[in-house]
Amino acid sequence: MRFDVIIVVSLLCLGCMMQPKPEASLYQRIGGLPMLTRISNQTLDIVSKDPKTSRSFDGVKMKTLKESLTNFLCVKTGGDCVYEGETMQKSHADLHITTAEFEWMVDVLRERLDVNGVGTREKNELLKILAPMKRDVVTN
């Protein structure tokens, strides 16, 4: 009887030691703050200069916008940043962003994720998180 108890306790302890490690957050898997900063900066550099979308960036302090977007993505992917910006709806209300403009920015973001080596799984997870925001950003 005592031997049986020792075996059971040993197996339970072994099972506790073999618990799978929790999966890394999307933030970690993407590459953390350095990668999110790079992707945010590159995306905004492209869309702010492209004739299809540049009008939305007239008079915008790009350094502040880049920091804000980086913090926003950090929070949305599970990082420990703090986003202090407005809601998506409030910050885009007066910009009259069209569906075509929104989709162009998503295309640029997708391309920047690819160029920077972000995996397909992580890219799709991020886009799935951001997709519902279309209704808050597009007003035309």
Residue spans of the language-model regions?
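C-terminal motif of bacterial Sec signal peptides marking the signal peptidase cleavage site
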Residues: C13-G15
